[in-house]
Amino acid sequence: MAKGFKLKELLSHQKEIEKAEKLENDLKKKKSQELKKEEPTIVTASNLKKLEKKEKKADVKKEVAADTEEYQSQALSKKEKRKLKKELKKMQEQDATEAQKHMSGDEDESGDDREEEEEEEEEEEGRLDLEKLAKSDSESEDDSESENDSEEDEDVVAKEESEEKEEQEEEQDVPLSDVEFDSDADVVPHHKLTVNNTKAMKHALERVQLPWKKHSFQEHQSVTSETNTDEHIKDIYDDTERELAFYKQSLDAVLVARDELKRLKVPFKRPLDYFAEMVKSDEHMDKIKGKLIEEASDKKAREEARRQRQLKKFGKQVQNATLQKRQLEKRETLEKIKSLKNKRKHNEIDHSEFNVGVEEEVEGKRFDRGRPNGKRAAKNAKYGQGGMKRFKRKNDATSSADVSGFSSRKMKGKTNRPGKSRRARRF
């Protein structure tokens, strides 16, 4: 116990020492900060020069901003605007170079003075140029420009024109007929304006159309279907259905033409000695037929697979429902058992609690027992119905008088097969 007490004393003493050291350090920091604040600031000649330069730059920037505002308000050309932008860029570059020089240090004061004078002269020249540009009229632009500036301006203008053309081409709409429907496409399709001048088209058709009605069917041999084919097609994107509709239309037209040619007594069947090659060969038509059959079988298989998936989902739903029902029943029975146990402890059980419904369950499962089971009856007759087997095999008056199981046919045994000679005699 003594050792533990000493250790506690040492720890508390050490903590007190640390607190005292922290307080001393805080006081020292506060005093140093107060002394720094009270120290007088020493202003050198270099600091004054820097302040003057900063003030001059600020004034120049303000003047340039004012000039640019006036310039924008007046109707000046794009070339003058570009010149102003170039001069502003030069000013920014000069500011950056001056900042780098100040960071490196003031080594040569004489060199700095010269640079300052040169900068001041350049700034004054820039101011004069800006004032001239602001006061100049739009009519005297071509006279004041030099050849180099004009070439540069032409290049810039050409670039701007090319950019504008590209933007216009990008913004141009594309007709809806030329667009492939794609989710990633950025093009906005538009509908072309169409003029459905039916009168003019009918008039043109009358001028071009030959009077076939006046002539016989043999001369034109053209059949027009009375009904529209697309009316009978449910899905126009179904290749099989569409091909069947075309086939039916052509077959109807052939039958009409056949009747007309028969009426005119014109031979239309191919002679027996004439063999002409079809437009599409039999191999090609077999390929088309096979492709159509394959597509139809694939479609049927997809539908069957979809139906099986739906049945599987339904089966899973039924299974889940039955499992949930079982879980609920189990939970209810467990809760009943638990409540009965609790009531048994406190002797609060009534006779109604034991009304489980066993008799109803048995009555529900009871089946018709009017007809005896034949298999069971035969076994009982052979082996007995259980119980004591002693003295069962001994005869009495009733058993000896019972002749129901006797058969003379069975006593005789099985009849032997006759020989070959007897069998031959039969036939």
Curated annotation (Swiss-Prot):
Acidic residues compositional bias, start-end: 106-126, 139-155, 163-185
Signal peptide positions on this chain: none
Gene Ontology biological-process annotations: nuclear division; ribosomal large subunit biogenesis; rRNA processing
Subunit structure: Interacts with LOC1, NOP12, SIZ2, ULS1 and WSS1.
Protein name: rRNA-processing protein EBP2
Region (Disordered): 29-190, 361-427
Polar residues composition-biased segments: 397-407
GO CC term, one of those recorded: preribosome, large subunit precursor
Organism placement in taxonomy: Eukaryota, Fungi, Dikarya, Ascomycota, Saccharomycotina
Modified residues (Phosphoserine): 104, 177, 183
Chief location category: nucleus
Listed Pfam families: Ebp2
Post-translational modification (record): Sumoylated.
Coiled-coil spans in chain: 45-174, 234-265, 291-348
Domain of life of the native organism: Eukaryota
Transmembrane segments: none
Protein's cellular compartments: Nucleus, Nucleolus
Function noted in UniProt: Required for the processing of the 27S pre-rRNA. Probably involved in the step of the processing of the 27 SA precursor into the 27 SB intermediate.
InterPro entries: Ebp2
UniProt similarity note: Belongs to the EBP2 family.
Biased composition (Basic and acidic residues): 29-40, 49-65, 89-105, 127-138
Alphabetically ordered keywords of this record: Coiled coil, Nucleus, Phosphoprotein, Ribosome biogenesis, Ubl conjugation
Gene: EBP2
Compositional bias annotation for Basic residues: 79-88, 409-427
Gene Ontology MF terms: identical protein binding; mRNA binding
